[in-house]
Amino acid sequence: MATKRSLSGESSGEPLIKRMAMASSPKKIRENYKRISGKLMSKMTLSIDNEYHYTFRIMSDNKIQEYYGDSQSFKDMEEGKCYDISLNYVKTKFSQMIQINEYKECEMEIETATPMSDYLTNKHFENEDGVNIIVKYKFIYKKINSGLYKVVFEVVYKNLNDDPDVVQVECSVNAKTLINLFKNNIKGSDDINEVFKYLKDNENQIFTIYSIKCQQIFNGSNVYMNWNVVNSTRIELCEAKESEAYSNLQNCTNAKINISRSNKHVASYNVNVLKSELEENDMGDNKFIVQFKSDELNIADSDDCSTSSDLGKWNKSVFYVNTNKKTEADSLQKLCADFNQISMLLEDNLIKVTIYVTVENGENHNMNVLGLLKYDEDENEYKFL
């Protein structure tokens, strides 16, 4: 039997339409005006002006829509389960909303309206298509002095000559979007450190990503291809292990082509030791010279995967301070102190450090620093610089 929702007077047991008629603020209701079947992806309680609002993100027909409910439906309905739902359209003088009225758990297959793509092409980005596709998750980094995170995936891509290759593609997200994207993977937690732990544990794992939007950006003669997370985007561990795309991604160890950049790819290295120096000039073009040692770097960037004879060498990378953004002297000195602190903490074995860099394709392998991740093993806590 379907459960009927209740609103403000939630324990009254009165039918919704009758309670609305008795409310002090007149409302017009179209009861059960629409029925849907879908999977509850997540739910959230919001407190605005001392009034509670209950929101539900439900996926139906490969789209995630948000609906209002009440405390009873919030208590009854469980994330990850599927429901047959009837909806009310409620209209007042100042607002209109769609609310869950009756709901009943059901069995259903979540079908995708958009078919799975075996590979990406330039057309997907030209048309800004939303795609469902199998990907390898590589890593996430946070840009220094920014609140922006970048997620790096590997995916099969066919160029204009129809030649398939495994390439890197990047996706920009803020903290809230990142938590929402992986909320089902971390059991509904709102702690971003839980997201970082999950992602570190699942580096190089194969996922299926749904409703990710392709985007093309022009900068002079260069074309950059990126992904955008939209409201209906979701990601889950891939179960199609027999597919050709899964096999291609699994067999690729280090993609050197990044379609989100020009003649560079993104790499991450666990650092043994690190040192940095601030270089300033009269033009205000400040940069940090960051040198580090890593046992992994020479293996990962060697074309034949052989190790260098000198694994203990210093590797030079550069972080350019954003000259388009006014950087106060105090902020620059704070960043200088942070780099210095990381060096000392690493030397004293109090933290572990991962560095994220762009690597130029070609002989020089010049590197620019993107981000630094600190890991406190005692607290099991990750923090980006």
UniProtKB/Swiss-Prot annotation:
Keywords, comma-separated and alphabetical: DNA-binding, Early protein, Host nucleus, Transcription, Transcription regulation
Q: Name the GO cellular-component terms.
A: nuclear viral factory
List the Gene Ontology MF annotations in alphabetical order. DNA binding
The residues forming a coiled coil are: none
Look up the record and give one Gene Ontology term from the biological process aspect. regulation of DNA-templated transcription
Segments carrying the region annotation (Nuclear localization signal) are: 26-32
Q: Where in the cell is it found?
A: Host nucleus
Task: Indicate the principal place this protein occupies in or around the cell.
Answer: host cell
- How is the subunit organization of this protein annotated in UniProt? Homotrimer. Interacts with alkaline nuclease. Interacts with HELI and IE1.
The job of this chain, per UniProt, is described as: Single-stranded DNA-binding protein that plays a role in viral DNA replication. Forms a stable complex with the alkaline nuclease and mediates the transport of the helicase to the host nucleus.
The UniProt family comment states: Belongs to the baculoviridae LEF-3 family.
Per its record, how is this protein called by name?
A: Late expression factor 3
